[in-house]
Amino acid sequence: PDSYDAPDPRIKQLARRSTVTPGGAACRYNDIIPADHCLHDVQDMSTLNHPRADLSKGQYGCVGQGLHIAKKLLPYIPNNAGILLVPCCRGGSAFTQGAEGTFSESTGASQDSARWGVGKPLYQDLISRTKAALQKNPKNVLLAVCWMQGEFDMSAATHAQQPALFTAMLTQFRADLSVFNAQCHGGSAADVPWICGDTTYYWKNTYATQYDTVYGGYKNRESEGVYFVPFMTDGNGVNTATNAPAEDPDIPASGYYGAASRTNGNQVSSNRPTHFSSWARRSIIPDRLATAILNAAGRTSAFISGKAPEIKPSPGGNTPSGPSADTSVRTISLLPAAGEAAAQGWSIKDGGIQLSDGVFKITKQSNKTWS
């Protein structure tokens, strides 16, 4: 956290665990909290500490790519905007095998949830947390979904079902999110790109035919808003580093300790080449995912200008809003269902009322009551 994995105050995440960091400040499910290298995913990776980690410096758990994707996107968004990550990952999950687990509105999917599909606990977790993120603030916009899944479908006899099950879930996700179309990239949930990442060379070498079916199912679907991102090799054709000790060695002279010094008690899997290294998750993986997001969603005036989406409420309705850090000052925005506020006779009466861009705002001042 004090070097490669340093957080940024403009990058937040939706909470899942009971504390922001192990032993840290308390938080509740779906609170907005700082994002770091080990996000609040379905599977809690915060206890798999590297044997050389200094926990007093926050060097806990495993390194994921989420924070690093966001950090690479920051230079491309307006300075007054931030990024809210919605962690919903579950390692070893599949569409065609695995335990379904359970889902709760107050805690999300259980850690043993390992089955994707329409209506499954993992899907309920994904859609409910996405909606929660958008409800936090009407200016929040769903930019993209990063999707890295397929390994455990390849090892199933029913692997050929994965592409159709994925497509069905994608279709349902977009339908369920259509109520938030105004807060989605392009003005529609159907326009939000799904950025589908590749896997390690181990999986392709072991399951060549299955790889072509599962990961091939993500390819050539740009017209559907599905974008495949290759990770298997770098720009020179060299295999992207995994957790194999030779590919992520310790470099004591530099103070870097990789997967080589992890053991069965603190590593993701004893089958080392099945997972990308933490170094890859800081570099080539977020580089390519961020680039894919920018190519799919970044070349729009709304993205470049940071213009908030227009929310069209029904008469008498409220626009969604998130909790305010300062409860002594609250703002309610009322938008006319049709026409302009000024044309309807609204005017400024005192300093607590503002009329800006056709939006009439009344701000509650500290130690004052509504009247």
Give the ranges of each region predicted by the language model.
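Cell-envelope and extracellular/periplasmic
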Residues: 1-316
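Extracellular glycan-recognition regions
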Residues: 319-371
